[in-house]
């Protein structure tokens, strides 16, 4: 799920009940680019600024990619809508991580 994708891109493990906005760059140009964990009341604004780029695309959760032009702004904020999920297991988040990732997950449980 989203935890695995974020980790594969160098992002953190975030406990599901934490109400945060998480932005993890995928294949960033700079090795100093890290994940951003923001409180849910913040709005993140990303603006395309380099006129020399021919193609800039935005893809969210693997959905259809949208082409962006120079100066376009994308605002990301917490939705006012809430989705209820069905929990099929009585295992805790850390137990599920441990079953999928083994010892690596135990480092984050403590």
Stretches with model-predicted labels:
Residues 4-110:
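Catalytic phosphate-donor-binding core of small-molecule kinases
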């Amino acid at each position: 799920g989203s935890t695995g994708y974020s980790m594969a891109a160098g992002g953190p493990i975030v406990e599901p009940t934490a109400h945060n906005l998480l932005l993890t760059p995928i294949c960033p140009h700079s090795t100093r680019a890290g994940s951003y964990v923001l409180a849910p009341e913040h709005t993140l604004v990303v603006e395309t600024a380099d006129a020399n780029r021919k193609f800039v695309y935005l893809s969210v959760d693997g959905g259809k990619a949208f082409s962006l032009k120079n100066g376009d702004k994308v605002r990301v904020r917490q939705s006012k809508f809430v989705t209820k999920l069905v929990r099929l297991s009585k295992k805790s988040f850390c137990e599920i991580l441990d079953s999928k990732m083994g010892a690596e997950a135990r480092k984050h449980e403590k």
